[in-house]
């Protein structure tokens, strides 16, 4: 009773086809694929930008730490 049979899924499929039509479903799937691709590209771009900022920040900290030690001596 808690699980869906094949007939439940067939009825859902028929209702979806009636609501959206045959031409609209591929268009929606294409738009969803473009959105996922754009999201992945954005995440990859953020990772590269974050890596560059982290490396530059650590280099600055090292230089300032060395200068402070040199000025104290």
Curated annotation (Swiss-Prot):
GO terms for cellular component: TAT protein transport complex. It holds the Pfam family TatA_B_E. It is a single-pass membrane protein. Disulfide bonds: none annotated. GO terms for biological process: protein transport by the Tat complex. Keywords: Cell inner membrane, Cell membrane, Membrane, Protein transport, Translocation, Transmembrane, Transmembrane helix, Transport. InterPro entries: TatA/B/E (IPR003369), TatA/E (IPR006312). One of its GO terms (molecular function) is protein transmembrane transporter activity. The keyword Cell inner membrane applies. The chain crosses the membrane at residues 1-21. It is found in: Cell inner membrane. HAMAP family: TatA_E. The Tat system comprises two distinct complexes: a TatABC complex, containing multiple copies of TatA, TatB and TatC subunits, and a separate TatA complex, containing only TatA subunits. Substrates initially bind to the TatABC complex, which probably triggers association of the separate TatA complex to form the active translocon. Belongs to the TatA/E family. NCBIfam families: PRK00720.1, tatAE. Part of the twin-arginine translocation (Tat) system that transports large folded proteins containing a characteristic twin-arginine motif in their signal peptide across membranes. TatA could form the protein-conducting channel of the Tat system. This is Sec-independent protein translocase protein TatA. It comes from Mesorhizobium japonicum (strain LMG 29417 / CECT 9101 / MAFF 303099) (Mesorhizobium loti (strain MAFF 303099)).
């Amino acid at each position: 009773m808690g699980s869906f049979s094949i007939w439940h899924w067939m009825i859902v499929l028929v209702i979806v086809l009636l609501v959206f039509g045959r031409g609209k479903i591929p268009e929606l799937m294409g738009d969803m694929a473009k959105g996922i691709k754009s999201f992945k590209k954005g995440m990859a771009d953020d990772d590269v930008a974050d890596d560059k900022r982290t490396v530059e920040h650590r280099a600055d900290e090292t230089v300032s730490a060395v200068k402070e030690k040199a000025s104290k001596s």
